[in-house]
């Protein structure tokens, strides 16, 4: 790998509460894509921006799905997904760096455009959870990006146009940052008094210990009534 990596999207695990999640994100002013049905059995909605997107991912109520990474995970943000222009090249690079990962897999979902059904196609390679304990990390290659980043879906009532910053809470920010650097050594890391900032090409990841997060985002915790904090 010869350059810093780009964030592709953030996956938000909804499990079987997709209708409720759609209602909440619509109230927040996002434009949601029509419901997608993956060939892997999962369902999704996307909120696409200029270069990245948020993805609500889950499974149908009462249905069965062979995706333990969704079924066994908590609700909420649990996927940090980077772009890949060639998933097999990414696979080779990860292998060279001796990073534990799963074999690439391919899947698709139908997309209707002017009553014509097409297929949005993807290839992914997932990294074992020893990189980030808080959730999944994987790479995604879009074989049909035009069926994801559609112009009519980029306009949001709340004027969002990209993911500016990601905040992560971690018991050991130094170790997590070190693990992420195994994926790509060109990521710039800046250590501050409060957190570690990792700069990707198109966004920034800030890793806080819980105590520092409370100090920096006290008003957010109060306003959102985050009792667990």
Predicted feature locations:
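N-terminal beta-strand motif that seeds the catalytic metal site of vicinal oxygen chelate
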Residues: 1-19, 77-82, 139-178, 220
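Short N-terminal helix-initiation segments at or just after the protein's N-terminus
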Residues: 16-30, 64-68, 81-83, 101-114, ...
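Glycine/small-residue-rich interface belts in oligomeric ring/scaffold proteins
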Residues: 20-75
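Active-site-adjacent scaffolding segments
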Residues: 53, 57-106
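Short, low-complexity cationic-aromatic patches
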Residues: 12, 18, 70-74, 129-132, ...
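Amphipathic alpha-helical segments
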Residues: 17-32, 90-97, 172-185, 229
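Vicinal oxygen chelate
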Residues: 46, 55, 92-162, 188-229
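Flexible, active-site-proximal loop/turn residues at the rims of small-molecule/cofactor binding pockets
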Residues: 16, 86, 226
């Amino acid at each position: 790998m010869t350059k810093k990596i780009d964030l592709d999207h953030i996956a938000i695990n909804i499990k079987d509460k997709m209708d409720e999640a759609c209602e909440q994100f619509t109230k927040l002013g996002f434009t949601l894509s029509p419901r997608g049905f993956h060939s892997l059995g999962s369902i999704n909605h996307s909120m696409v921006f200029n270069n990245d997107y948020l993805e609500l991912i889950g499974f149908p109520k009462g249905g069965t799905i062979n995706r333990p990474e969704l079924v066994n995970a908590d609700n909420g943000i649990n996927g940090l997904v980077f772009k890949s222009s060639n998933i097999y090249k990414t696979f080779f690079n990860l292998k060279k760096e001796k990073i534990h990962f799963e074999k690439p897999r391919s899947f698709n979902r139908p997309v209707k455009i002017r009553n014509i059904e097409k297929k949005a196609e993807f290839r992914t390679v997932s990294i074992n959870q020893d990189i980030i304990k808080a959730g999944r990390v994987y790479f995604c290659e879009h074989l049909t990006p035009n069926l994801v980043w559609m112009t009519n879906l980029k306009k949001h009532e709340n004027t969002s146009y990209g993911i500016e910053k990601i905040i992560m809470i971690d018991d050991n920010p130094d170790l997590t940052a070190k693990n992420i650097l195994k994926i790509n050594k060109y990521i710039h890391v800046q250590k501050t008094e409060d957190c570690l900032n990792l700069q990707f090409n198109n966004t920034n990841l800030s890793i806080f210990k819980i105590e520092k997060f409370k100090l920096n985002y006290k008003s957010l915790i109060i306003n959102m009534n985050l009792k667990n904090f």
